[in-house]
From Swiss-Prot:
Biological process annotations from GO: polysaccharide catabolic process
GO molecular function, one term: beta-galactosidase activity
EC numbers on record: 3.2.1.23
Gene of this entry: lacA
Native organism: Aspergillus fumigatus (strain CBS 144.89 / FGSC A1163 / CEA10)
Disulphides: 205-206, 266-315
Cited InterPro entries: Betagal_dom2 (IPR018954), Betagal_dom2_sf (IPR037110), BetaGal_dom3 (IPR025972), BetaGal_dom3_sf (IPR036833), BetaGal_jelly_roll_dom (IPR025300), Galactose-bd-like_sf (IPR008979), Gly_Hdrlase_35_cat (IPR031330), Glyco_hydro_35_CS (IPR019801)
PROSITE patterns cross-referenced by the UniProt entry: GLYCOSYL_HYDROL_F35
Binding site for substrate: 96, 140-142, 199, 260, 364
Keyword check for Glycoprotein: yes
Localization: Secreted
Catalytic activity of the protein: Hydrolysis of terminal non-reducing beta-D-galactose residues in beta-D-galactosides
Glycosylation (residues): 156, 373, 402, 422, 622, 760, 777, 914
GO cellular component terms, A-Z: extracellular region
Protein name as it appears in the record: Probable beta-galactosidase A
Length: 1006
C-alpha cells in the first residue's frame, strides 16, 4: 500500500510554500504535501494519521525509553542499554544532546570520542531501535544550565526567545548537531525517525512574548536547513496545545506533551495523591491536535532527587511496578500511539554535568539502574506491558471511549475505559475509581463481543482487581486467525509457529480468570494440574476458567496452546526477534514480530538468530537458570547459548529445555585503605609564599549578565571570565589600614554549595551548605591586622552546576556563580582587588577528551594531577582515611590493578563511610573522569557506581580524591572501599575502554 508523506512544515525551509491536502485511507485521514516531488522524499519512510505513525508504510506504535548518551561516557556500553530496552518490547529510544558539552567555547563545536553521536546511531541500528532526536538547543534534563553552555550568561539577550543575540548564539551548535542527526535519519539508512525542536516550550513570564511563533519557526528552520526531513514533534510540558498543528507560525508536525502525574516526593513513596491520575488526556488531544497520533513524549518513569533527598531507591519505590500497571495502562486507555518513558536508563552526572538540584547519580529510579541492572521489578512489569503492545497491532485501530463506572463492571468502585474496535478487536482498561485504593475488589464484566453481550465470568466465580493494579481485558482478540472472544487474564504475547500457535496469559496472585475461544475443538490440559480449573464447550466456543497458580498450565484448543501463568512466572519470559545472523537485530515490524520466538530464561535474553541447523541465543544469567525455548524453528536441531553448544530435551509440547549453570567467579578487589596513597596540599593559595600573578584578574567594570546587576565594584561573576564548572577560587588583595575587623561575603554556587574563607593563612570559617540555599551571606571576624601590611582573602566556592531555564523570560540560567557582594568593615569595597580561577583555561579547557565541565579550579585539577600517572613519586605518602587535621583541601592519588574475568558484567562501586563528624566534601576521580561528588553533611549519596570502560577491568587504574575539610578540626574519610554486586554471566561483547589520556605537564598551568 502506498502511503504518502506529510509535512506540516515543508521538508526543507526552501520548500515552505505549498498547502496540505487530505486523503482518506481505510477510513483514516492522512496528511501529505501537495507537491508530488516533495512527497516522494518521505513516502516510504515516516508518515502518520490520527491513529499512529507509519514507518516504511507499516502502522506502528512507538514505545520508547529515554536514554542520554552523555550520561554514560562509554560508547561500547550503549549496545547493552539498547538491547535491554529492546527486550522490554520497545522499539524506540529518545535522547537529548547536551549543548554545554559540545560547544564549551563559543564557535568551537566538538563532538568526538565519548561525545560523538554517530556511534550512538550505529548501535541503535544494530539493536533495531528507532531514535527520537532531541538536541534542544534547550533540554532542561536536570543538566547544568538545562544544557545551555555557561557562556550564554554573557549573551545580551533573553534566552529561548527571538532576541537576535540569543538566536545567533544557537546557530553554530544547531547547524552542526542537526546536520549530524540528519545523516542518521531513516532516509539515509539511519535510525532517526523523529526530531524535536526546543523542549517544553510551555510557559513564560517577565513580559516575554509567548508563545512566540517567530522563535519556534526559527528553531524549526535551523533544523530543516541542516537537512532534517523527518517529522517534527514537540513536548508541551502539559496539555496546553502550544505549537500544535494548525496554530500557525512555529507549529510542529505532530503535537506531543509530557506528564509526571505522581510528582517527585520520593520521601513518601507509598503516597499517591488524590486526583493525580490523568483522566482528560483523550478529550484534550481531540481539542488540540485531532489529526495527529496521540503522543506522550515524556511520561514519568522515575523521579529526580535533590541534595539531601531520600535517595533513588525511594524514587524507584515511588514510581514502581504498581505505578506502571495503573498509569501506563491508563495512558493506553487514551490511545497513546507514541509513548516515551523518562527515564528508562538514567546514568550518571559525571564530570559536573548536572544542575544544582541533583547530585552525581542520575539513577532516577528508572527501570534500568544506574549500573545497568535489570533487577527492579518495574523492569519486569514494563516488559509485560511492552510486549503486550508489540503483539497487539489492533490496539492502534481501536477508538478510545469515555471512562465510566457503569455499563461494563458491576461495581462503581471500578472504572472502565473502552477502546472499541470495528471488527479489529477491543480493549477494556479496568482500574479502581479511587486510583489510590489498596483494596481487593471483586467484580464481573458485561462485555460486547462478536458472540453477543456476555456477562463474565460465565462459569461462576468473580474476577478480582487487587489494590493499585489495573487490567487490560481483550475482546475479539486475533491470535493468527483464532478469535479470542474475551480474556480476563492479560496477554503477554502470542506467536504463530506454523504448525501451532502459542498464547501466553497471566494473572496476579489470588485471581480467578476466564477466557473464551472461538474454536470447535475440545479443551485439553496438556501440562499442569486440572485442579481449580474448569472448561465448557458452548457451541463453537470453548470457555476456560482457572485460578491463578505459580504452577504452569498449558491448555490446548485445536492448534492453539494457551500458557496460563502467574505474573511472577511470566517475568522470566522473553520474546526475542529471530534474526538472520548475529550482526544486528531488525527494527520492530510485522515481519520481525511474527518471526520472534519465546524463551524462558530468567535474568535477560538479548538476541536470537539461526545459523545453519543451529539456534543461537545470547543471554545473561545471575543464577543457575532453567531455559526453555518455545517455538524453535523446524529447520534447527542444535542450541547454542552464548556460543556454547548446549544439550537440551524436547517435551511432548515441542518445548526445548535445558539448564545453564551459574558459578560466580571470585572477585578480588583491592583494599582502598591499603593503597600506596600519595598526598599533595591542593589549597596552596593560602600559603604566604603563593604567587597568583598568572591568574586572571577580576577587573571588569561591568557585567554582560543581563539578569543580575553588579553589587561589587568589579564583576566577580565567574562566567564573565569563562569559568562555568566545579570549584572556584578567589583571591582578594588589600592593604590594611588597621580598621578592618569583619568581612561579610555573599557567595552563590547553587543548591547545597559550600564555601570557605581564609585571610592569609588564617582560617576564617565556612558555609557548609544546605540544599535550601543557593547562596549565603557569611560574616567572619578577622584576626588583628596591621596597618600598611598586604593581606589576601582566599575564598573557595563549590559550584553545583548552573540553574536550568525552564520558564521562558526568567533567564534563570544566568544566575551567576561566585561572589555576589562583600564588605570589609571600615573600608570601601574598591579597596580589594580580585583575581579568580576555575578550570585551567576556562573555555579554552585543557582536556578535550573528558570535556569542558569535568574539572574545576583546584591546584591539582589545574595541573592535571587527577589524570593517570601524575608526577607523584616525590609526594608525601598519606591516606585520605588519615585525612587533614585542619581546614583545607588535600589531594590524594593512588593506582591499583583489576583482574575481573571476561564474560562477566560486574558492577563496581566506590563507597564512602557516612560521617556525622565535621563537614567535608570529596571529589572522586577515576582514570581522570570525575565520577563523584560526596558531601558528608548533606548527602544522600555515599555509593558511586563507576562503569567498566571508565574503570579498566583488566589492567591498571588511577583513583584520585580531593578532600575539602570545611571546619576547624579538619576531616578524614570514615571509610572508603571498592565493592561489587552480583556478577552477571553476560553475552556482552568486549568493552572497549574510553580514552583515558595520562598526565602531561600543562603549558601555562599555575
Amino acid at each position: 500500500m502506498k502511503l504518502l508523506s506529510v509535512c506540516a512544515i515543508a521538508l526543507l525551509a526552501a520548500q515552505a510554500a505549498g498547502a496540505s491536502i487530505k486523503h482518506m485511507l481505510n477510513g483514516f485521514t492522512l496528511m501529505e504535501h501537495s507537491d508530488p516531488a516533495k512527497r516522494e522524499l518521505l513516502q516510504k519512510y515516516v508518515t502518520w494519521d490520527e491513529k499512529s505513525l507509519f514507518v516504511n508504510g507499516e502502522r506502528i506504535m512507538i514505545f520508547s525509553g529515554e536514554v542520554h548518551p552523555f550520561r554514560l561516557p562509554v560508547p561500547s556500553l550503549w549496545l547493552d542499554v539498547f538491547q535491554k530496552i529492546k527486550a522490554l518490547g520497545f522499539n524506540c529510544v529518545s535522547f537529548y544532546v547536551d549543548w554545554a558539552l559540545l560547544e564549551g567555547k563559543p564557535g568551537e563545536y566538538r563532538a568526538e570520542g565519548n561525545f560523538a553521536l554517530e556511534p550512538f546511531f550505529d548501535v541503535a541500528k544494530q539493536a533495531g531501535i528507532y531514535l527520537l532526536a532531541r538536541p534542544g538547543p534547550y533540554i532542561n534534563a536536570e543538566a547544568s544550565g538545562g544544557g545551555f553552555p555557561g557562556w550564554l550568561q554573557r549573551v545580551n539577550g533573553t534566552l529561548r526567545t527571538s532576541d537576535p543575540a540569543y538566536l545567533k548564539a544557537t546557530d553554530n551548535y544547531i547547524a552542526h548537531v542537526a546536520a549530524t542527526i540528519a545523516k542518521g535519519q531513516i532516509t539515509n539508512g539511519g535510525p532517526v525517525i523523529l526530531y524535536q525542536p526546543e523542549n517544553e516550550y510551555s510557559g513564560a513570564c517577565c513580559d516575554a512574548t509567548f508563545p512566540d511563533g517567530d522563535y519556534m519557526q526559527y528553531v524549526i528552520d535551523q533544523a530543516r536547513n541542516a537537512g532534517i526531513v523527518v517529522p517534527l514533534i514537540n513536548n508541551d510540558a502539559w496539555t496546553g496545545g502550544h505549537n500544535a498543528p494548525g496554530t500557525g507560525k512555529g507549529e510542529v508536525d505532530i503535537y506531543g506533551h509530557d506528564s509526571y502525574p505522581l510528582g517527585f516526593d520520593c520521601g513518601h513513596p507509598s503516597v499517591w495523591p488524590k486526583g493525580n491520575l490523568p483522566t482528560t488526556f483523550r478529550t484534550d488531544h481531540l481539542k488540540q491536535s485531532p489529526t495527529t497520533p496521540y503522543s506522550l513524549i515524556e511520561f514519568q518513569a522515575g523521579s529526580f532527587d535533590p541534595w539531601g533527598g531520600p535517595g533513588f531507591a525511594a524514587c524507584a519505590a515511588l514510581v514502581n511496578h504498581e505505578f506502571e500497571r495503573v498509569f501506563y495502562k491508563n495512558d493506553l486507555s487514551f490511545g497513546a500511539a507514541i509513548l516515551n518513558l523518562y527515564m528508562t536508563f538514567g546514568g550518571t552526572n559525571w564530570g559536573n554535568l548536572g544542575h544544582p538540584g541533583g547530585y552525581t547519580s542520575y539513577d532516577y529510579g528508572s527501570p534500568l539502574t544506574e549500573s545497568r541492572n535489570v533487577t527492579r521489578e518495574k523492569y519486569s512489569e514494563l516488559k509485560l506491558i511492552g510486549n503486550f503492545v508489540k503483539a497487539s497491532p489492533s490496539y492502534l485501530l481501536a477508538t478510545p471511549g469515555n471512562l465510566t463506572t457503569s455499563g461494563y463492571a458491576d461495581t462503581a468502585d471500578l472504572t472502565v475505559t473502552p477502546l472499541l474496535g470495528n471488527g479489529t478487536g477491543s480493549y477494556f482498561v479496568v482500574r479502581h475509581t479511587d486510583y489510590t485504593s489498596q483494596a481487593s475488589t471483586p467484580y464481573k464484566l458485561s462485555l460486547p463481543t462478536s458472540a453477543g453481550r456476555l456477562t463474565v465470568p460465565q462459569l461462576g466465580g468473580t474476577l478480582t482487581l487487587n489494590g493499585r493494579d489495573s487490567k487490560i481485558h481483550v475482546v475479539d482478540y486475533n491470535v493468527a486467525g483464532t478469535n479470542i472472544i474475551y480474556s480476563t487474564a492479560e496477554v503477554f504475547t502470542w506467536k504463530n509457529f506454523g504448525d501451532s500457535k502459542v498464547l501466553i496469559l497471566y494473572g496476579g496472585p489470588g485471581e480467578h480468570h476466564e477466557l473464551a475461544v472461538s474454536f470447535k475443538s475440545d479443551v485439553q490440559v496438556v501440562e499442569g494440574s486440572n485442579s481449580e480449573f474448569k472448561s465448557k464447550k458452548v457451541g463453537d466456543v470453548a470457555v476456560v476458567a482457572w485460578d491463578v497458580s505459580p504452577s504452569r498450565r498449558i491448555v490446548q484448543i485445536g492448534d492453539l496452546k494457551i500458557f496460563l501463568l502467574d505474573r511472577n512466572s511470566v517475568y522470566n519470559y522473553w520474546v526475542p526477534q529471530l534474526d538472520k545472523d548475529d550482526s544486528s537485530t531488525g527494527y520492530s515490524s510485522e515481519k520481525t514480530t511474527a518471526s520472534s520466538i519465546i524463551v524462558k530464561a530468567g535474568y535477560l535474553v538479548r538476541t536470537a538468530y539461526t545459523k545453519g541447523s543451529g539456534l543461537y541465543l545470547t543471554a545473561d544469567f545471575n543464577a543457575t537458570t532453567p531455559v526453555e525455548v518455545i517455538g524453535a524453528p523446524s529447520n534447527v536441531r542444535n542450541l547454542y547459548i552464548n556460543g556454547e553448544k548446549t544439550q537440551f530435551k524436547t517435551d511432548k509440547n515441542g518445548i526445548w529445555s535445558t539448564e545453564v549453570k551459574y558459578s560466580a567467579p571470585k572477585i578480588k578487589l583491592p583494599s582502598m585503605k591499603d593503597l600506596d596513597w600519595k598526598y599533595l596540599d591542593t589549597l596552596q593559595e593560602v600559603q604566604s609564599t603563593y604567587d597568583d600573578s598568572a591568574w586572571p584578574a577580576a577587573d571588569l567594570d561591568t557585567t554582560p549578565n543581563t539578569l543580575r546587576p553588579l553589587t561589587t565594584p568589579k564583576s566577580l561573576y565567574s562566567s564573565d571570565y569563562g569559568f562555568h564548572t566545579g570549584y572556584l577560587i578567589y583571591r582578594g588583595h588589600f592593604v590594611a589600614d588597621g580598621s578592618e575587623t569583619t568581612f561579610d561575603v555573599r557567595t552563590q554556587g547553587g543548591s547545597a554549595f559550600g564555601s570557605s574563607v581564609w585571610l592569609n593563612e588564617s582560617f576564617l570559617g565556612s558555609w557548609t551548605g544546605l540544599n535550601a540555599n543557593a547562596d549565603y551571606n557569611s560574616t567572619y571576624k578577622l584576626p588583628q591586622v596591621e596597618q600598611g601590611k598586604n593581606y589576601v582573602l582566599t575564598i573557595l566556592i563549590d559550584t553545583m552546576g548552573l540553574n536550568e531555564n525552564w520558564v521562558v523570560g526568567t533567564d534563570e540560567m544566568k544566575n551567576p556563580r561566585g561572589i555576589l557582594s562583600y564588605k570589609l568593615s571600615g573600608r570601601d569595597a574598591s579597596a580589594i582587588t580580585w583575581k579568580l580561577t576555575g578550570n585551567l583555561g576556562g573555555e579554552d579547557y585543557q582536556d578535550k577528551i573528558r570535556g569542558p565541565l569535568n574539572e574545576g579550579g583546584l591546584y591539582a585539577e589545574r595541573q592535571g594531577f587527577h589524570q593517570p600517572q601524575p608526577p607523584s613519586q616525590k609526594w608525601k605518602s598519606a591516606s585520605p582515611l588519615d585525612g587533614l587535621s585542619k581546614p583545607g583541601i588535600g589531594f590524594y592519588t593512588a593506582q591499583f590493578d583489576l583482574d575481573i574475568p571476561s564474560g562477566w558484567d560486574v558492577p563496581l562501586y566506590f563507597n564512602f563511610g557516612n560521617s556525622t563528624k565535621s563537614a567535608y566534601r570529596v571529589q572522586l576521580y577515576v582514570n581522570g573522569y570525575q565520577y563523584g561528588k560526596f558531601v558528608s553533611n548533606i548527602g544522600p549519596q555515599t555509593s558511586f557506581p563507576v562503569p567498566q570502560g571508565i574503570l579498566n577491568y583488566q589492567g591498571t587504574n588511577w583513583v584520585a580524591l580531593t578532600l575539602w575539610a570545611l571546619e576547624s578540626d579538619g576531616a578524614k574519610l570514615d571509610d572508603f572501599e571498592l565493592v561489587n554486586t552480583t556478577p552477571v554471566m553476560t553475552a556482552l561483547s568486549k568493552i572497549r575502554p574510553s580514552k583515558q589520556p595520562n598526565y602531561r605537564q600543562r603549558k601555562g598551568a599555575y
